[in-house]
Amino acid sequence: MPSETIDSTKQFEFQISDWNSYHELDQEEEEKYVIQLFGRTEDDHDVCLKVTGYTPFFYVEIPKQWKQRQVDKFVEILKNKVQYHCKKNLDEDFDLSKSLIKYAMVKKHKFYNFRNKQLYNFLLLVFKSHTAMKEFSSILARPLEAKGLTNKPMLYQRYESNIEPHIRFMHINNLSSCGWASIDKDKLKKIPEYSNCDYSFSVNWKDVKPSNNDDRMAPFKIMGYDIECVSCDQNFPQAERPSDKIIQIGITMYRYGSMKCYEQHILTLKKCAPIEGVNVECYKKEKGLLRGFAKKIAELRPDFKTGYNNFGFDDKYIYDRILRIDKREGKKQGVNINALKNKFMDEILRTIGKVNNNYLIENEGLDRIPIYTTVKDKKISSKASRFIQIRGGTYVENGNNLKYVQSPGITYFEVKNLSSSALGDNELKFIQIPGVLSIDMMKVIQRDHRLIGYKLDNVSANFITEKADKIIEMPHNQEDSDSEKEDEDTDDKTYDVNIYTKSTKALEKDSYIQIMVNDGYSSSPLSEGAKYKVYDIQTITEKKLNEKTNKEEIFVYQAIKTKICQKDIQQLRETIKNPLLGISWTFAKDDMHHTKINEYFEEGDPKKIRQIAKYCLKDCKLVNLLLAKLEIIVNSVGMAKVCHVPLSYLFLRGQGVKIFSLVSKKCREKNFLIPVLRRKSKDNEGDEDETYEGATVITPKPNVYLSPIGVLDYSSLYPNSMRERNLSQECYVDDSKYDNLPGYIYHDVEIILKDKKGKILRNIDGTPQKEYHRFAQEIITDEQINRELKDIFDKINTVFENNVAIIQNQKYFTEKNISELIDKHKNISDSKIEDIEFDESLSDKRKNKLVDAEKDSLDKNIGFYQKIKSQIDKIKLDSKIEIDNLSKNLNEEEKSKQINKMELNTKNLISKVFSKYLITEQQREELIVLEKERAKRSVNAEKAKVYNTVDGITVRYGILPEILTELLNKRKETNGKLANEKDPFVKAILNALQLAFKVTANSLYGQTGAPTSPLYFIAIAACTTAIGRERLHYAKKTVEDNFPGSEVIYGDSVTGDTPIITRHQNGDINITTIEELGSKWKPYEIFKAHEKNSNRKFKQQSQYPTDSEVWTAKGWAKIKRVIRHKTVKKIYRVLTHTGCIDVTEDHSLLDPNQNIIKPINCQIGTELLHGFPESNNVYDNISEQEAYVWGFFMGDGSCGSYQTKNGIKYSWALNNQDLDVLNKCKKYLEETENIQFKILDTMKSSSVYKLVPIRKIKYMVNKYRKIFYDNKKYKLVPKEILNSTKDIKNSFLEGYYAADGSRKETENMGCRRCDIKGKISAQCLFYLLKSLGYNVSINIRSDKNQIYRLTFSNKKQRKNPIAIKKIQLMNETSNDHDGDYVYDLETESGSFHAGVGEMIVKNTDSIFINFHIKDENGEEKTDKEALMKTIAKCQRAAKLINQNVPKPQSIVYEKTLHPFILVAKKKYVGLLFEKSPDKYFLKSMGIVLKRRDNAPIVKIVVGGIIDNILKNRDIDKAIEYTKIVLDKLMNGEYPMDKFIISKTLKSRYKKPSTIAHKVLADRMAVRDPGNKPQINDRIPFVYIVKDMGKKKKKDILQGDLIEHPEYVIANNLKIDYLYYLEHQIINPASQILELMMDTKDVQKFFNKYIIDEQNKRKGAQSLTKWMDFSKLPKESGSKTAKKPYQSQKLQKTKSSNKSQIDPKYINLIKNKSRKHECQNMNKWISSTDKCTDDWEPIVE
């Protein structure tokens, strides 16, 4: 019975669990809005609160010139429109226009667009009912004709009519949605008949206030329930069949925070034998059982009810059975079902729940209020629906079914369609009970967790599991031993076993477990199908030595006591001995098939009925345990509080409503109104197809990285990006009128536009289309800050003064003092050591000496304090051990007394220690300084919570940034509490809260970019990602600039024939192509592997001699290495007047300020960085005569050799039409070469004369080929000329121009020009001309892209020499043989000269950091020391970035990946180290190890390959492992569970016949209609071998090749192993193997298995088995196979197709055996902590 009294305190407080709203009829028979609040008090009484008097409202924007007269007229017109609409469409007697009870003009700010705090005119409309509010809003959604006010229909903008009234009530009263409410007891009116709760009150809405104590949880009641049904056949039960009745309903009751079931009920048909601890109620008929269930819920009054798939099966089955009873009764009486006087549905729904439904119907007229609902109209089509009005408690036709309609004020059955990215399409069918929140655990787990399957047994095994730390066989007593001897040869003998584990949460005594064995790649049962009963669970405490700290520590275990049979115990012993295998236990659901339930129920034996009942109750308990284990309630409460929405919204609504409530609450506080956004129709014009450049993702670089790769990560990048530039709707500047106003600063953001498909939109000239957005931010003065934060600053000052007073008066230290002083000195010392270690001017020896000295200094400074601390720590440890070892026989009271006594003794001992040490005045002053620093930090922290600082100016946040600031600050505060909290109960609450803050902050950005969101504002979403990109690039640049030698692994490339200017250490300048800089190519694993079309095998490097330099933006700089790789990419030619270069589309060019710019972002007129070296004019060992001849040869000379039948012939000639010029050359040649020459008349045949040598032709050819030609037969200006005096250079130019100048000297054009073929030739001539002082411009021919025209003059160039004049798409690199090689340089300066002319480009850049840690010999290290240094440098880099990055951005060191396999974009796996080089775990993302649409066999194969590469760094072992598992696979040695795939069944498909699991689901529905798969179910299936007859392969559908696992077993079908190999394994395995092997070798490797299986199916023997290869030498398919190494000559032969060692791994070979350069790598790996995840990848 409800209690009549409450305690004597003044305030009545309870925690809210559920919200509901409905309408009652007032005295005028009009609807009146009512809010219901349900909850529970701290002393465990449930509450129902009827909140009255709240009136829904919304706003309409009205013209600024309107006065009261116009407003009155407008309201009159609006009311008339509503009245007309009601009469036309609704009940004529029900006029909603009368429900408008108040209206008024108000002034508010608009939320959208910056208006400098301007107030606008709005009309506030207040209503009696939410129904009326929606009707008025609906009228205003369309243009309204207001005669007398406007000449034509106008659209009046609505504001906040889309905020639900009870949400707005929550905002106004500042209530926490599921926190604690507080009401003055004088304001409460008792209405005990209103509900069945302990307390039923009515209260005015203004009197409901928030409690001051919200960090607590009421002892909520949680009901788990499950139904059992029988079937008239062997198929699954179907509710519409008369005999498929509900035979049992189980109920288990738990309290929030407890794992113990305090009450159990089983309602059953037929007699049931008693069950200990269970209330058994037996019924003769199903109707009585259902009536009993309704009464039981009313009696128990739970706050939450939960089941498993209860939204998909249980509630709907109950509803359908009740409906069937009404149908049968109507048929029996011969009346329509609605004519029944006492409908069973009415009885059940009025009985069930907390509210007294009969009272609401009789006293508040709920049955007379019209309800508006949508029903399917089968007369139109199967999908058509219509909107109808009906009274409560009525059945209506809904397609082929009946729908029961009831008022939302009382219990009703609801069918809700919910679509979300997390859940997909869902139809939720459930009984909605006001005050009892319904949760379907299956839907929750589907939303939050990606599992292979969602059957209850799979889910429970997945979550109720733990690693077995050790397993101990317990000794038997003599009696047991004797009996065992007698039964020694039997399998019935069992062994007592204790499984020690960290936690057994959600595991109970008498439940069952399975023992799982993990080989690193997948888990399998110790014995297939074996389950072991849990006989007991005990807590065991052990004292052990921690090997790392060398200290004794207390370890607490949970020991699971079970029994294992002899066969399994032997297997368990062998498993325990194997160090490579891991053991865990999982919950094993004690399942009962529905056919067995049928059988037992038919027998009717009370004991058999009891077995069904026990099974039913176990499922109820299991759901409760899962709810507690996954902390669903506390996490959901945290999220609901943060977002200000009822708890039920988290289970029944999408993401948008949460963020909308959060923002609308803040807007209300700031006097802003949010408009109701109009959705654009498809026919409307607009830019809805335009999107913005999305999130920045690091360009993928697929490879196996052996060097440590450090990763830095911005904290809350997107939320902080919004805060950094004040991105908020009301700050957006869209009108120049409000630009550059005093008192504000302005932020500009540039975004790149994309189309709907994500492609960048471009202008006519090819440059990206951009938009520029601006946001205003208010400046705030110090006076304002001190005024607004006065109370907070006063509190900080008071705390400071009190603490200083305590310090000045205290004689002895406290624990806090000691800790603070130690931390202070450690922080100072750590900072000094860091500065020393990163001081590049110091040698390693000097660094070590200084670090040792600093450590000695630290020991001296803190030695005194450490001595005290050690004594205190020992006292505390002894006390803990003493408390842990208290006798377990003590009851709770005795135990508590003993603990209190021990703790008091500990405090006394600690006081004695401190009493020995007096504080000196110096130490006292030191403590006071620490207090001052703490107070200063507190002041700055409080300011940062409210304001931001931009360039030294304090500014106020806009609404969205302020919300984000509050969320992030609250998360920080909550984490601070969490770190110090000891109570696990409170810790769970705090952890849920901090997680909710984080998720909500990240979700806010997403809502601004979601078109369906009421907060949609695409500019904010676009600007957020743009700022994020800026921050990432800034971080990258900071690292590059501050860490010399750090390598960046995002490669840019130029073509191989690109000219490069180099300088030898002796000063000689040379011009060569970039491809000729490299020699002795070897693998370069970290370069250029990111490209989509890049062949990862051809990434190579060549170390460049240290005696040469390249010209760069910073002068001459060392070349670290030359890099090349093959790719298939677009090549762009970028031409300025003084520079021309061919680059890949992603190459980084530089602007004059050395900012990076990509070719695709350039346009005509863009200025680029140019620079040119001073010429080297030193050599004079060539005569001017010879230089003239050389120049002539460069212009029109030729030489070479050719094969004839008589042998090799040589030719050398100078060619020209001018005999005078040739005679001049003849004279000079005969003087310098001492050879006779002659002129041949070849005018008729060649139109030129030829000057040729009479003898020594071979000598002339060899000499000129050597100095004039590169390896591609392009002519060069000899380096002797490039470095000679100006006179010699002028002679060379004179000779060249005489031979090939396009204009003669006699032509008076003011300039000269020449055309030359080839980049290298053009650049040589360009350099020559520049060194002679000419201004040279470059042009190109569109018809012949290898011809360059150089125009030179002494006059000043008229046009901007560094501005782009042409951008030309040349072509793609070749598609043949994996593409062409493209090249790059790594230089110390980060840039280099390239191409024809003076252009300087950027070399490689990236976000991933490789610091290239080297040993004393300059060799790169990849060992533990390299890892430690990488971690340290990353931490240092984070500090440097944070010194200059705009607030509130902050970057942190996140992790180091070592080694690291990057497969593709967002697909990687590696060993992740954080701060310790001794602790790591496997980190993976997007790879097959965790994808649900891959069978477990894929994880076994690919996981093993990864394991051997990452842990063992052994390619051969990876190959050998692959062979072993593929042999086992094709021989059928793996169990079927390794081949099960599962996919989600969606509601619609374009071509359902092509969707395999949809076809299977349809087959399953035909075979067993009652067990028909539901929308969003995971459908498990296996590919089977199936004879498809004469069907062509292309005509075979996937759905024909799969079957459900149970069907496969029942029908003894064969698994198609070949399908798994070809379609699931080969692709992901090849992606990794091809990082280290030739593609063709990988193909051969897998083809062997494919051919063998195909032959086997045809009945043919495989070729490999037919032939005897036993005597042939063994070969590995791996490029790194272990094979004898012969002579260099033999290795280079190409006479065989044998796989060769990839050059990348040559350096791993030492003394004819493969070893990594880190010789002790394996020892190091084995010495570190074991993988914390047992090689179960952590997926992002």
Curated annotation (Swiss-Prot):
Residues 1685-1700 have a biased composition (Polar residues). Residues 480-491 have a biased composition (Acidic residues). Residues 1189-1334 form the DOD-type homing endonuclease domain. Keywords: Autocatalytic cleavage, DNA replication, DNA-binding, DNA-directed DNA polymerase, Nucleotidyltransferase, Protein splicing, Repeat, Transferase, Viral DNA replication. GO terms for molecular function: 3'-5'-DNA exonuclease activity; DNA binding; DNA-directed DNA polymerase activity; endonuclease activity; nucleotide binding. InterPro entries: DNA-dir_DNA_pol_B, DNA-dir_DNA_pol_B_exonuc, DNA-dir_DNA_pol_B_multi_dom, DNA/RNA_pol_sf, DNA_pol_B_thumb, DNA_pol_palm_dom_sf, DNA_pol_type-B, Hint_dom_sf. It catalyses: DNA(n) + a 2'-deoxyribonucleoside 5'-triphosphate = DNA(n+1) + diphosphate. Its EC number is 2.7.7.7. Belongs to the DNA polymerase type-B family. This is DNA polymerase. It comes from Acanthamoeba polyphaga mimivirus. The lineage of its organism: Viruses, Varidnaviria, Bamfordvirae, Nucleocytoviricota, Megaviricetes.
